[in-house]
Regions:
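Generic structural signal for well-ordered alpha-helical scaffold segments
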Residues: 30, 73-77, 177
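Conserved Radical SAM active-site core
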Residues: 15, 20-24, 39-42, 46, ...
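Conserved AdoMet/S-adenosylmethionine-binding subsite of the radical SAM
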Residues: 93-229
């Protein structure tokens, strides 16, 4: 297991006027959520206030390069695809993230935002598909869930539960039913890589007649746990 740097600097990068701290911008197939399989440009912003046990992008906690929005947009345009995913880390931890999201929408891109669920999403442009990661007990960060976010989501958005165990699944199922999420928007259940067998999760969902999607991380099936894919 890697050692996670929990210093404040890696949690939320110090702001610089007009700039965003970027870990990487890359082109790959979307591996998760509604657009899985689509060629997509990923903008991975640096820093995250959470430390989930199953995190597969710890390298985004530190480092990165300060860039202005014009520089980011130029790189995105070079890949010639209409699909863009802004991810992290926790992208909303950076103040200028909203400016980037707005610029992407105004330029005509189809944009998704992958967020931890611990930051307020109410001000995110409604043209963006918000993919909210609700933290299960196995993540070690359940107490950071900002449940009020669910009140502002629409059928255009998605919620995701990453499951580390059967206990996580039972917890997620209880929350889904208690909050009426099945009738509101797409729900994604994803087995934590190497911790829950995908076939087991599939059978649990079938047994319980849940109106959800079982989500496997396509990029990991294709390339393994490799950054930039």
């Amino acid at each position: 297991m890697s050692v996670i740097d929990s210093s404040e600097e890696t949690r939320i990068p110090v702001s610089r006027e007009g700039l965003l701290k970027v870990t990487e911008i890359f082109y790959s197939l979307q591996g998760e959520a509604r657009d899985a399989g689509r060629p997509t440009v990923f903008i991975r912003l640096t820093g995250c206030p959470l430390r989930c046990v199953y995190c597969d992008s710890e390298y985004a906690f530190y480092g990165g390069e300060w860039q202005n929005i014009d520089q980011i947009m130029e790189q995105v345009a070079s890949y010639q695809t209409p699909y863009v995913c802004v991810t992290g880390g926790e992208p909303l931890a950076q103040k200028r993230c909203q400016d980037l999201l707005n610029r992407l929408c105004e330029t005509g891109y189809r944009v998704s935002l992958e967020t931890s669920g611990a930051m307020d999403v109410s001000q995110v442009d409604e043209r963006i598909s918000r993919v909210l990661d609700i933290k299960t007990p196995g993540s070690g960060e359940t107490g950071r869930n900002l449940w009020s976010n669910l009140d502002v989501l629409s059928e255009h958005d998605q919620v995701k539960f990453v499951l580390c165990s059967r206990a996580d699944y039972d917890w997620a199922m209880a929350e889904i039913r208690k909050r009426g999420l099945e009738q509101k928007l797409d729900i994604l259940l994803s087995p934590a890589w190497g911790q829950v067998e995908p076939a087991d999760l599939a059978q649990w969902v079938l047994n319980d007649h849940l109106n959800v999607r079982v989500q496997l991380q396509l990029h990991k099936l294709l390339w393994g746990d490799v950054p930039g894919k």
